[in-house]
């Protein structure tokens, strides 16, 4: 019997999330359109935005949907003077003005968390960084 132990990288989809995706895929409409189908699509998106915001203690306006991690990193980091670790994905390091090395245990020391981009858990090594400060 096999056991999947790479949850740090990717975890199986929860059945509730799968059902929500299936339900959402039945809604056809451009959320920017004013017709009934468009309004239904927009309502679906806005309800999802509010659920996510509530789950993390934010407001709906703070939630931005993107196509993936690379686009998200660009949105968050472009135009900023950011320090990151050499362990980050290229989607992050390509925006960093300086790159920090890790110690022999894979831990990165961050001196200025407000100007830093550092993943908490590395998806390849599973190493958890010890920092808890930062801007959310």
Predicted regions and their residues:
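Pyridoxal 5′-phosphate
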Residues: 1-136
């Amino acid at each position: 019997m096999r056991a999947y132990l790479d949850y740090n990288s990717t975890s199986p989809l929860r059945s509730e999330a799968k059902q929500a995706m299936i339900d959402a895929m039945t809604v056809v409409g451009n959320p920017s359109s004013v017709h009934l189908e468009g309004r239904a699509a927009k309502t679906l998106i806005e309800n999802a935005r509010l659920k996510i915001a509530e789950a993390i203690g934010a407001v709906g306006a703070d939630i931005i949907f993107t196509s993936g991690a690379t686009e998200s990193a660009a949105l968050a980091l472009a135009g900023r003077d950011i320090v990151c670790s050499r362990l980050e994905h290229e989607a992050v390091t390509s925006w960093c003005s300086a790159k920090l090395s890790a110690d022999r245990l894979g831990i990165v020391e961050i001196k200025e968390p407000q100007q830093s981009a550092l993943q908490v858990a590395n998806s390849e090594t599973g190493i958890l960084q010890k920092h808890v400060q930062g801007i959310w």
